[in-house]
Amino acid sequence: LDDHDDRLAAHAREIGLEVGLQHGGGLGERMNAALRDGLQEAARVLLVGSDCPVLDQTYLALAVDGLDNARVVLGASEDGGYVLIGGSDASVWHDRRFEGVRLGTDYAMADTLVALNDVAPVTVLPPLWDVDIPEDVTRARNLGVLP
């Protein structure tokens, strides 16, 4: 989270999750810090985007299972990005891990895989779609996943 939200934190605790504040400069630095810091407390960490209305419990379970045999899991998106990233090894997440990765673009997945070229194995999950442009909102409404 960018700011502390007492209601969200309370709900997360009710279902056995922990919510933390983000720190770092850009998105890559914040993601890196969240993965590295989270792995100091837990064996596996998933960062999940908030713009994928079709991401469900089954997909999250695939991501967790993907970390059984990999140090990193990526949930692909149809547009070349990803809807989640996870890890099981804190040593992967050094300060320059996302350097050169064009996050938020159609190149995010490809760039991230290049940035992870020294990490093996990496699990890549089947692509989902996320909401980035007005047509995606229409798609979500037509599928009944957004009002």
Question: Model-flagged regions — what are they?
Answer:
Residues 2-6:
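A conserved acidic beta->alpha catalytic loop
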Residues 11-44, 105:
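Short phosphate-binding loop-to-helix
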Residues 41-44, 70-71, 120:
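Short coil/turn segments at beta-strand junctions that form active-site/ligand-binding loops
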Residues 48-50:
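Active-site acidic Asp-centered loop
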Residues 107-147:
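Conserved alpha/beta core of the MobA/IspD/sugar-nucleotide pyrophosphorylase nucleotidyltransferase superfamily
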